[in-house]
Amino acid sequence: MKKLFFIAISLIMATMLYAEDYKSINFEQLPASTQKLVNAHFADNPILAVKATDTWFRFNREYEIIFDDGVTIDFDSDGQWTEIECYGAPVPFFMLPDKIVKYVRHNFHQEKIVEIKKLPEGYKIEYDSGIELLFDKNSELVSFEWE
């Protein structure tokens, strides 16, 4: 009986540990660095929704802003962007290092970027054609995949 009780408690704790709690918030509740970026570069782009996600027993909070033109930007708990989705919208190239922008515009100018991720090891760029590029922290191309 003790084993069964321990297993049940363990399952409940594991569920709580990995559960995510989504909620809508006001723009003013975003970290100051996020507000500054949005006000500086997206002031003319109406915001449809601002969401906060609490994870890991609410020790970590992530944010998502959905804009009217189809751009969605995710931010970490420090207010730094982590992912950009640009389905049907222009890519905000100012958020990428210049070296990556030059490479992408020169070599893949006819492809449409749909997602950009900032990773611990660099940047990942995904195209609607299935091409994925991985750049290191020095903006050097390290991986090219075509799905």
Language model features by range: what are they?
Residues 1-22, 38:
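Bacterial Sec-dependent N-terminal signal peptides
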